[in-house]
């Protein structure tokens, strides 16, 4: 079965800038990350997850979505997977998106994410 790419989102996050923002505004962690994501201690991993949320918003073309409506979870293999809930899931449904692809990376003080949304 052929699928159609609905959108591609790419984002880059400066790790030090995110670290400073989280230190300056402790409540920001709760606004940006789900309870499971808040357990992560490596700032590079948090930055990559924030990049994924931004990239997901770009795919959906829906500004103002709650950050916690897009979550990065790890499969048993360690591979990251994007899970959308709430208004992000509603926006994805409206676009017909049924499959997400996610790639995360961090090096040299930056974190990147690429998100692809597909429909049948």
What are these regions (language model features)?
Residues 1-120:
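Core catalytic alpha/beta fold that binds nucleotide/phospho-ligands
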């Amino acid at each position: 079965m052929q699928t159609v790419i609905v959108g591609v989102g790419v984002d880059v996050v400066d790790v030090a800038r995110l670290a400073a923002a989280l230190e300056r505004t402790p409540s920001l962690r709760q606004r940006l990350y789900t309870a499971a994501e808040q357990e992560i201690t490596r700032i590079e991993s948090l930055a990559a997850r924030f990049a994924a949320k931004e990239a997901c918003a770009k795919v959906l073309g829906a500004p103002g979505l709650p950050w916690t409506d897009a979550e990065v979870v790890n499969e048993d293999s360690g591979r990251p997977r994007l899970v959308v809930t709430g208004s992000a899931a509603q926006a994805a449904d409206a676009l017909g998106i049924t499959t997400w692809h996610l790639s995360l990376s961090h090096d040299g003080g930056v974190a990147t994410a690429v998100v692809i949304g597909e429909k049948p």
